[in-house]
Amino acid sequence: MTRSLLWQMVIVLGAILMVNYVLTTLTPQTQEPVVDVSYSRFKTELAADNVAAITFEGNNVVGNLRERTILNRVEGTEEVQSFLRFRTTMPPVTDTRLLDDLEQRKVDVKVRPESKPSPWATAMIYMLPWLLIVGVWWFVIKGMRTRQGPGGGMMGGFSKSGAKMYTKERSRVTFADVAGLDEAKQELMEIIEFLRNPKKFMRLGAKAPRGVLLVGPPGTGKTLMARAVAGEAEVPFFTISASQFIEMFVGVGASRVRDLFNNAKKNAPSIIFIDELDAVGRSRGTGLGGGNDEREQTLNQLLSEMDGFEAHDEVIVMSATNRPDVLDPALLRPGRFDRQVTVERPDWRAREEILKVHTRQVPIDEDVDLQIIARSTPGMCGADLENLVNEAALIAARENAQKVTMQHFEQAKDRVLMGTERKLVMSQQEKRITAYHEAGHTLLARLSPGADPIHKVSIIPRGQALGVTQQLPVDDRYHYSRSYLMTRIAVSLGGRAAEKAIFEEYSTGAQNDLKQATDLAEKMVCQWGMSERVGPMSINRGEEHPFLGRKLASDNAFSQHMAWIIDQEIEKVVKAGEQAADEIIANHLPVLKKLADALLEEEVLDRTRVDEVLRETGIEVQDDPAAHPDGDHVLQGELAGGAVEG
């Protein structure tokens, strides 16, 4: 039962009780109450000539006395109970003298027929509880149908897929709203063209792909691309989330898959879009419990519908996932998902186009340069950029500004990349520790060859960090050398080295730095073959989660001796980074103190101010950072700039 329906019933019941209370309490009681007495008491009052009138109703006698008479006394008090009207029951033995006594004492005698309930009324009394139960049940069913909508309701609606159908008029998103995904748009436009004009392809013997799988990290625009296809295609577009197939009853998932494809076939040519495919498409044969069996039944039905005995060339299936590694191999074979369209993070040119799309409805000032913003946000995907524009607009609205300026975008970027500024009260000693910690990161980042340029360093608490040193590469990186990675590790440990040099002890502020350095060293040794002792090997160590659909338990594909070697090599890499950080800090202690003093005074330093401080101490810095090589994309944006938290 829905909450609104329940409240309606409570209100109606409360109104009925209120009306009954008003009628019973506020209505004046003018009639004398009737008191039940014994037949002997009735005869006694009759003998005393105190009965004025009586009425016979079957075996019952109701009468009035001439004078009020005491009924009884309350023990222990002076209070008495009296009555004027009475009621009694005739005995089963006939009293032959009663009528003579009544006539002799001139008692007004009336006779009424005994009232018997109507058969219909009796039937209604017995049926009323059942009618109430049926009525409540009907309200419950109606409420569930209203709440769940099409495909919901009770038993009959569980087999409905619940997919929403979009037409060109209903979907307002087109490819013009999708920027930076030219390759993916080209792949999908070919499919849309096939549905619009199939003869163009069929005359050459070409067949449309049965399925298209959109693969990419979260936030890169996979679902947005599907919305654009719905807006561009001149055919019905059915959309559903894969999690909607699974229900509390066994067999519902397979039934909903059949219903979805039946609706698509009735409206062919059409497109089906299944979002988050990994919810039902995980590899079969693993997992425990009935829920896993239900998911496998749903997956089997999906496989059969996509490429079974019945052909459906005019129904194309699209899907999106960010976990293609856990999908069942049968889903990815030709004939089902023929094409896998990779939706990657955009480069700076694509980011500029995405910013243009998201700023269409935002009044921006003339000083806003979207190209500068795009270049200063490496690694950001479409969702991140949309959030960046929204944050800038919120900041401008908070300041009652008429337009969004470049300063608002800078504040929004700091909020997104470094976290929300916190009003945390810190002691002077803790501020000094934070300042030297961030100065250590900054000094390592500015003096280490090949390091990413400093964008901003702050000792204002943001997010969960007490201070942040932000580095941004000049351009997007797709290839990382060993020397660059070693520099990243050294920069991560620069804050810890500064604390040791100044305060001669370590603090807990380097917790996140140590984690970053260790994770990076582990990837260098285990995945990228950058260890001479381990060699050119790729070793899965602590990455795979066995319960994601691949295995029932984790196992190591290497010996205990190799595990010991890996630990030694990871420690060696981290120690090398620590040694490099210690050397740079030890050789530039005056510069470190100068940077820390500037941070304590100004709290936030940008790259220009950092370079000014370095020049004041006699260190010449290059304006143009070391160039980095281009090549294959290795880290997929994971190291494309970042913030070192103190």
Curated annotation (Swiss-Prot):
Binds 1 zinc ion per subunit. One of its GO terms (molecular function) is ATP-dependent peptidase activity. ATP binds at residues 216-223. SMART domains: AAA. InterPro entries: AAA+_ATPase (IPR003593), AAA_lid_3 (IPR041569), ATPase_AAA_core (IPR003959), ATPase_AAA_CS (IPR003960), FtsH (IPR005936), P-loop_NTPase (IPR027417), Pept_M41_FtsH_extracell (IPR011546), Peptidase_M41 (IPR000642). The keyword Cell inner membrane applies. It is a multi-pass membrane protein. Disulfide bonds: none annotated. Pfam families: AAA, AAA_lid_3, FtsH_ext, Peptidase_M41. Residues 26-120 are periplasmic. Its cofactor is Zn(2+). It comes from the Bacteria. Its main location: membrane. PROSITE patterns: AAA. Zn(2+) binds at residues 437, 441, 513. SUPFAM superfamilies: FtsH protease domain-like, P-loop containing nucleoside triphosphate hydrolases. Its EC number is 3.4.24.-. HAMAP family: FtsH (MF_01458). In the central section; belongs to the AAA ATPase family. In the C-terminal section; belongs to the peptidase M41 family. PANTHER family: ATP-DEPENDENT ZINC METALLOPROTEASE YME1L1, METALLOPROTEASE M41 FTSH. This is ATP-dependent zinc metalloprotease FtsH. The gene is ftsH.
